């Protein structure tokens, strides 16, 4: 499952699993773009379209949208389900960039 791996990249990563039909996902889009700009060069941001990447969603155990993985270098992911952008900057600051 998505929690059983250790990431070995050189920058922390945020992975956003989303879909065009998901209202909360679409409302989250501008906030995620804002965060990607704010942390440019420090954190890598990826978006995964759940409709196009069903196997990837299954592999990572994604069952609801939006689901975000906050992955520190050399650490296990912090998984957030639902559109709660007020928590995201705190997770990035306290968990990914510590």
Question: Can you name each region flagged by the protein language model?
Answer:
Residues 1-13:
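A short beta-strand-turn-helix
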Residues 10-13, 17-21, 64:
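Short pre-active-site segment immediately N-terminal to redox-active cysteine/selenocysteine motifs
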Residues 26-39:
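Typically the conserved alpha-helix immediately C-terminal to a functionally engaged Cys/Sec
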Residues 48-58, 85:
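Structural microenvironment flanking redox-active thiols in thiol-disulfide oxidoreductases
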Residues 59-63:
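A short glycine-leucine-enriched loop at secondary-structure breakpoints
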Residues 64, 69-98:
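Non-catalytic, surface beta->alpha helical segment in thiol-disulfide oxidoreductase systems
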């Amino acid at each position: 499952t998505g929690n059983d791996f250790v990431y070995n990249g050189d920058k922390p990563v945020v992975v956003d699993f989303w879909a065009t039909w998901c209202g909360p996902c679409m409302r989250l889009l501008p906030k995620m773009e804002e965060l990607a700009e704010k942390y440019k060069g420090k954190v890598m941001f990826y978006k995964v379209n759940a409709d196009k990447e069903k196997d990837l969603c299954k592999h990572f155990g994604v069952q609801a949208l939006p689901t975000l993985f906050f992955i520190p270098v050399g650490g296990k992911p912090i998984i957030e389900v639902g559109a709660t952008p007020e928590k995201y900057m705190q997770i990035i600051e306290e968990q990914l960039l510590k």
